[in-house]
């Protein structure tokens, strides 16, 4: 075998000295013509071995050099996925937020999931209330964790900050998504207060949380006002999400604007919750209270429940009374009377039963004969008069009102029947506070060309009810003031009006039964025919029989009657039998008016009072007047229908 160039094969000892003969000696390569030697192959250059330092990696695996880079890549991937998921929240739900059933189906049978024609998208339902972890009632705030998972969406805290996203849909399935608030978690608060205020039905959420904190429903303490403009002096305010410093300061800040304040403070994961019963110095509406409390507590108006309290509820009053005695409440001012009345034993024992005679006496003293007016006016005394309060607490208010008006009418009818016309005029005059000027009446009579002496003589016989002289007729064209003159006199004397339009009824004359003076306004030709046929006795002033509804026929002396008409019955021979029964006065001139439409001559109760006081001697005589009323006023005892207190022996 030929020897290879550059290789020596030894034998014997020479082979032993040469590592057994298998080691190959370095080959010698000759350089070709034109070859340029590089700096790396320069044999003469000094080699220090620096280029071979990292030629072989001798480091052990697991030193953690690649771990930060790998984690950074994973973290960026998660952040990118979360950002994309947040942008897609208004559209079809992504697989990351799809239901658990869809994920399980796609993972167990991917081939079946791939060939499905229409994927059913389950509508995401937002929880109305988050599950409480049990740490919500502590006053110490706990820092937020680094990573939170809520509703299938992951909240991570990266190197650049914290990103929160929440995918919500309105309750009721309308398909509209609400924008989620992105807030930064802070270690000072255990949970974000604004999370609860993103729901669509905020009031239901607040009512539920109120019941959890205070142990009873908010509706048990309040009555609802539908209008925000309704005025009330007492208000129940429950504010959520109040800062701790503000909650402590409100006990002092609210004192200048209210007369009474009952404040309770509770804590939850949303922050401080304040329940207040406030009595303001003046009545306020819900809008005013909301604006005032929003400024005072530094919270939005939507975070408050504002309604008036139940002032007639015993359990409600007892709740405020018992909680005010505990150390968990701050109370300022005097306790409202509706709480004291329903809780304190002394006030409860002082409550008396309703007395009908007291109601009748009150209606008689105030000259009330209308049921609606009596019910309204007496109900307004519920906070002042104990009998009125017992009346409001009764279930027979309508019956009491009807009975009281009936008795009041009986008393007044009997009182009127016992008085003569002179006494009645004096009685009506005492009801008028001021005294006017009788010259207004005299000037008006002169303006209508009516002799004052003739009128006074006819009025004297008219008021006395002299037969054939107890009917005064005022004749003239329209707009001459006939009705104005007669109506003003009738109002002062407290008379009654009858209308010919009701002549078809048997009871159209029944108002004359309870009146001292009557008036038939604007009698037409047909009315005069009816009077000439059926009412000649009425014009005479003699006793007549009047039919009343649900009553027997009543026989009485007909009161004096005034008639206004545009027809002169004295000129018509068809009414010749009425000529001797009436006294006629002509008003031929139109009533003058001021620029504002008021009459130039004022005919009111004050002027009629002055008229009768100054001309009393011509009508009745001075002796009877002096007996009726002396210088110190009326000497008659006032009517009393309530039982007095009788002194009984011990």
From Swiss-Prot:
The keyword Transcription does not apply. ATP-dependent DNA 3'-5' helicase required for initiation of viral DNA replication. It forms a complex with the viral E2 protein. The E1-E2 complex binds to the replication origin which contains binding sites for both proteins. During the initial step, a dimer of E1 interacts with a dimer of protein E2 leading to a complex that binds the viral origin of replication with high specificity. Then, a second dimer of E1 displaces the E2 dimer in an ATP-dependent manner to form the E1 tetramer. It is found in: Host nucleus. GO terms for cellular component: host cell nucleus. Keywords: ATP-binding, DNA replication, DNA-binding, Early protein, Helicase, Host nucleus, Hydrolase, Isomerase, Isopeptide bond, Nucleotide-binding, Phosphoprotein, Ubl conjugation. This is Replication protein E1. Residues 450-600 form the SF3 helicase domain. Residues 134-184, 620-650 are annotated as: Disordered. There is a cross-link at residue 557 (Glycyl lysine isopeptide (Lys-Gly) (interchain with G-Cter in SUMO)). Its main location: host cell. It is an enzyme of class 5 (isomerase). The modification Phosphoserine is found at residues 94, 98, 109. Belongs to the papillomaviridae E1 protein family. Disulfide bonds: none annotated. ATP binds at residues 476-483. It comes from Human papillomavirus 72. Residues 622-633 have a biased composition (Acidic residues). Phosphorylated. GO terms for molecular function: ATP binding; ATP hydrolysis activity; DNA binding; DNA helicase activity. PROSITE patterns: SF3_HELICASE_1 (PS51206). A motif (Nuclear export signal) lies at residues 108-117.
């Amino acid at each position: 075998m030929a020897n290879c160039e550059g290789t020596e094969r030894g034998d014997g000892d020479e082979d032993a000295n040469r590592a057994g003969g298998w080691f190959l000696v370095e080959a010698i390569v000759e350089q070709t013509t034109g070859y340029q030697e590089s700096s790396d192959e320069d044999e003469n250059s000094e080699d220090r071995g620096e280029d071979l330092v990292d030629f072989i990696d001798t480091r052990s695996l697991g030193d953690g050099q690649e771990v930060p880079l790998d984690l950074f890549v994973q973290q960026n991937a998660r952040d990118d996925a979360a950002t994309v998921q947040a942008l897609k929240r208004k559209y079809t739900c992504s697989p990351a937020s799809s239901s658990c059933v869809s994920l399980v189906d796609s993972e167990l049978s991917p081939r079946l999931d791939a060939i499905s024609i229409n994927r059913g998208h389950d509508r995401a339902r937002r929880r109305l209330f988050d599950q409480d972890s049990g740490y919500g009632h502590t006053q110490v705030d706990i820092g937020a964790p680094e990573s939170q998972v809520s509703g299938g969406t992951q909240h991570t805290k990266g190197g650049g900050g914290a990103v929160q996203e929440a995918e919500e849909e309105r309750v009721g399935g309308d398909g509209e998504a609400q924008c989620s608030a992105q807030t930064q978690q802070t270690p000072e608060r255990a949970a974000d207060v604004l999370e609860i205020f993103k729901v669509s039905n905020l009031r239901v959420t607040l009512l539920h949380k109120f019941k959890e904190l205070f142990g009873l429903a908010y509706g048990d303490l309040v009555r609802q006002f539908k209008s925000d403009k309704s005025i009330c002096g007492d208000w129940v305010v429950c504010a959520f999400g109040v800062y701790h410093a503000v909650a402590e300061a409100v006990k002092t800040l609210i004192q200048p604007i209210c007369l009474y304040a009952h404040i309770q403070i509770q804590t939850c994961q949303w922050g401080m919750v304040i329940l207040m019963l406030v009595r303001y110095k003046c009545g306020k509406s819900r809008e005013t209270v909301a604006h005032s409390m929003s400024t005072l507590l530094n919270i939005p108006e939507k975070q408050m429940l504002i309604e008036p309290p139940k002032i007639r509820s015993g359990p409600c009053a007892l709740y405020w009374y018992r909680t005010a005695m505990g150390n968990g409440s701050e109370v300022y001012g005097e306790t409202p009377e509706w709480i004291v009345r329903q809780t304190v034993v002394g006030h409860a024992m002082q409550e008396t039963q309703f007395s009908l005679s007291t109601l009748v006496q009150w209606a008689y003293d105030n000259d009330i004969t209308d049921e609606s007016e009596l019910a309204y006016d007496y109900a307004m005394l519920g906070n002042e008069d104990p009998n009125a309060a017992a009346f409001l607490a009764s279930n027979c208010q309508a019956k009491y009102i009807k009975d009281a008006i009936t008795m009041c009418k009986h008393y007044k009818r009997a009182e009127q029947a016992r008085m003569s016309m002179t006494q009645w005029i004096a009685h009506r005059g005492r009801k008028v506070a001021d005294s006017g000027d009788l010259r207004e009446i005299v000037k008006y009579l002169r303006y209508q060309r009516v002799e004052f002496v003739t009128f006074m003589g006819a009025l004297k016989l008219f008021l006395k009810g002299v037969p054939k002289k107890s009917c005064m007729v005022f004749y003239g064209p329209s707009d001459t003031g006939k009705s104005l003159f007669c109506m003003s006199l009738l109002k002062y004397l407290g008379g009654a009006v009858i209308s010919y339009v009701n002549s078809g009824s048997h009871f159209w004359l029944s108002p004359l039964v309870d009146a001292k003076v009557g008036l038939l306004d604007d009698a037409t030709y047909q009315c005069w025919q009816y009077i000439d046929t059926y009412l000649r006795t009425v014009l005479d002033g003699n006793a007549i029989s009047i039919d009343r509804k649900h009553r027997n026929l009543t026989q009485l002396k007909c009161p004096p009657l005034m008639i206004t008409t545009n027809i002169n019955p004295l000129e018509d021979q068809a009414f010749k039998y009425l000529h001797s029964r009436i006294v006629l006065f002509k008003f031929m001139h139109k009533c003058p008016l001021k620029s504002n439409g008021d009459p130039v001559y004022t005919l009111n109760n004050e002027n009629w009072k002055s008229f009768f006081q100054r001309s009393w001697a011509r009508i009745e005589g001075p002796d009877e007047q002096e007996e009726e009323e002396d210088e110190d006023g009326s000497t008659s005892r006032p009517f009393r229908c309530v039982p007095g207190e009788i002194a009984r022996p011990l």
